[in-house]
A protein has these predicted regions:
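Tandem CBS (Cystathionine beta-synthase) repeat/Bateman regulatory domains
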Residues: 1-156
Length: 156
């Protein structure tokens, strides 16, 4: 189920844009299992969890890079391919900080954790949707404008 995204003040937090629940795999699962989940659920990533704690992430890009080298990699355990350590946020992390962390680390998705357990995921797509929904507001704070401008510059 998608997180409820409501336009409002820029005091919004990660929990207002995150997706929950999040598709997960275990470190010992085979890469082919993670790939099948991505295709079946039409999603761009799965979070790797161990005892409910997020320890890594597998994206479409991770899989395509590995499979391009050899299809034998599909039987490899997820832990050998996953990206980590993770940069994470909490449900109460301000959206401005979420944007900043994505830009700083060059990542597109941030797991949302509470008491070390995975509770959601914020993606660039979720943030774009949020920005579009609040775009009717007459003034976007300078902080958000600067972060979005830097993100746009980084892509060109």
């Amino acid at each position: 189920m998608r997180g409820k995204v409501e336009p409002g003040s820029f005091g919004d937090f990660a929990e207002s844009v995150m997706v929950s629940p999040v598709e997960t795999v275990k470190p010992t699962d085979r890469l082919v299992y993670a790939m099948k989940k991505l295709v079946k659920k039409n999603i761009g990533c799965v979070v790797v969890v161990e005892r409910k704690k997020p320890v890594g992430i597998i994206t479409e890009r991770d899989i395509s890079r590995k499979v391009a080298k050899s299809t034998k990699v599909l039987m490899t355990q997820v832990k050998r391919v996953m990206s980590g350590p993770l940069v994470t946020v909490t449900p109460s992390t301000p959206i401005a900080k979420v944007l900043y962390l994505m830009l700083k680390h060059g990542i597109r998705r941030l797991p949302v954790i509470e008491k070390e357990e995975l509770v959601g995921l914020v993606s660039e797509r979720d943030l774009v949707r949020w920005v579009l929904q609040i775009s009717y507001e007459p003034q976007i704070p300078v902080e958000i404008k600067q972060i979005l401008a830097k993100r746009s510059e980084a892509k060109t």
